[in-house]
From Swiss-Prot:
The keyword Ligase applies. One of its GO terms (biological process) is cysteinyl-tRNA aminoacylation. This is Cysteine--tRNA ligase. Its main location: cytoplasm. GO terms for molecular function: ATP binding; cysteine-tRNA ligase activity; zinc ion binding. ATP binds at residue 272. InterPro entries: Cys-tRNA-ligase, Cys-tRNA-synt_Ia_DALR, Cys-tRNA/MSH_ligase, Rossmann-like_a/b/a_fold, tRNA-synt_1_cat_dom, tRNAsynth_Ia_anticodon-bd.
Length: 485
């Protein structure tokens, strides 16, 4: 049975949709004012894997992922570039879709845009106002009265009394309490006309948090089975969503809350605000990029490497970005494709009674543990290389498909040049044998994973090394010796 870690309860729980066999899943998507970076790639791929596994498990999924197409950052980009809001958002939506296609991210079933649901947002604001949870401020904004919602902080574990004004929430002089947040922003004279809507409160536009409350409730109803998003959304965005939706309608907004871990760069989260980001297209483009073209030529080998880089780690664990880590991911993916190139797959699909398929399923049913699932892929690759088994190769390819991997033709895959693997300098060359330094580095990474009790990751590293012809022997005292098989 599938178990999911619920951020709300802080425990791993058996997953039971409100309606048997049907899953209503909402994920907070992009604010479209710039290109997607690798941190966004992690969120997109993580929830793509989630919905793929739910469907592979026989569940009917209604997957909604929104687009925020009105926001302060979008307005600034439009003003800076002299373009209309719609021109900015349409361009970056097209760019986002190009990135998703490159990474093998399947489109959500529905992809609403915030500007299509302003009427529904105003309805929720009116409900909150009638219940004393929203008020009109002197500056024309409509704010949420946070202290009127007794459960505020239940998702993030933050206490209102412990939150200091100005630390995480901007202080506004028109707010009754510095922790209150805006539901409706009054129009400013200098703002473009296409950022303003008529409302009972005068011209203005919605605040960020109210958008998701309106779209999720309108499209999926309450409660959602799963609400997901990036690590930085737990507070304040998701906390505020709960306050709005549950304050307006009563009952739970979502039964399960999921948050993927951050992508780190030198101990900091990758983000545009820190300036330490690398875009998806910079990482996987084939040839030059243009800031006037949303579409771009993709290197399919590098694109799948980036997806593999994300999938081989558990979605909740922090993941570190470094160029060497991409090289390591490329070499590991090459070894899986080499097994498929060496042995023709039987094409029979997944045999779930087979031991490695059972291990794969057990891992995925354990909070979508794709790291453990990847370990099963390497065991199959090792078997295919050792025995020439078409069945093992077929299982490898079919299980890879569940994760959105290993569907390229192996000879064509190796013909694509890659910037991330020395083994690709010769067309069609198999992954080069790991040298001693690389093996020792992988053993050190495995030891760190074991120390952090991430045993699935440790097992995955062992399986990757075995597929590369390296056997490990754990000795007493934490020492690990290795030998070439």
């Amino acid at each position: 049975m599938l178990h999911i870690y619920n951020t709300l309860s802080r425990t791993k729980e058996p997953f039971k949709p409100a309606h048997a066999g049907q899953v209503r899943m909402y994920v907070c998507g992009m604010t479209v004012y710039d290109y997607c970076h690798l941190g966004h790639a992690r969120m997109l791929v993580a929830f793509d894997v989630v919905q793929r596994w739910l469907r592979a498990s026989g569940l009917a999924v209604d997957y909604v992922r929104n687009i925020t197409d009105i926001d302060d950052k979008i307005i600034r980009r439009a003003v800076e570039t002299g373009r209309r809001i719609g021109e900015v958002t349409e361009y970056y939506i097209a760019a986002m879709h190009a990135d998703e296609r490159a990474l093998g991210v399947q489109p959500p079933d529905r992809e609403p845009r915030a500007t299509q649901y302003v009427g529904e947002m105003l309805d929720i604001i009116g409900r909150l106002e009638s219940k004393g949870l929203a008020y009109r401020a002197e500056d024309g904004d409509v704010n949420y009265a946070v202290r009127g919602f007794a459960d505020y902080g239940k998702l993030s574990g933050k206490s209102l009394d412990d939150l200091r004004a100005g630390e995480r929430v901007a202080v506004g002089s028109a707010k009754r309490d510095p922790l209150d947040f805006v539901l409706w922003k009054s129009a400013k004279p200098q703002e473009p006309d296409d950022t303003k809507w008529e409302s009972p409160y005068g011209l203005g536009r919605p605040g960020w948090h109210i958008e998701c409350s309106a779209m999720s409730k309108t499209l999926l109803g309450l409660p959602l089975d799963i609400h997901g998003g990036g690590p930085d959304l737990k507070f304040p965005h998701h906390e505020n969503e709960i306050a709005q939706t549950e304050g307006a309608f009563g009952g739970a907004l979502a039964n399960v809350w999921m948050h993927c871990g951050p992508l780190m760069v030198d101990a900091d989260k990758m983000s545009k605000s820190l300036g330490n980001f690398r875009t998806i297209r910079q990482t996987i483009a084939q040839g030059a990029l243009s800031d006037t073209q949303a579409e771009y030529a993709v290197n399919p080998r590098e694109a799948e490497m980036l997806r593999f880089f994300i999938v081989r780690n558990h979605y909740r664990s922090p993941q570190n970005y470094a160029p060497d880590n991409l090289v390591d991911a490329q070499n590991a993916l090459d070894r899986l494709y080499q097994a498929l190139q060496n042995t023709a797959a039987d094409g029979q699909g997944v045999d779930w009674s087979e031991p490695q398929a059972q291990a794969f399923k057990a891992a995925m049913d354990d909070d979508f543990n794709s790291s453990g699932a990847v370990a099963a892929l390497f065991e199959l690759a090792s078997e295919a290389n050792r025995t020439g088994s078409a069945r093992a190769a077929g299982q490898l390819k079919a299980l890879g498909a569940v994760l959105g991997l290993l569907q390229q033709d192996p000879p064509a895959y190796f013909q694509s040049p890659t910037r991330y693997s020395a083994a690709a300098r010769e067309q069609g060359a198999p992954a080069a044998a790991l040298d001693a330094a690389a093996i020792e580095a992988r053993i050190a990474e495995r030891a760190a994973a074991k120390a952090a009790r991430d045993f699935a990751r440790a097992d995955a590293i062992r399986a990757e090394l075995r597929a590369a012809g390296v056997e490990l022997d754990d000795k007493p005292g934490g020492l690990t010796q290795w030998r070439r098989a």
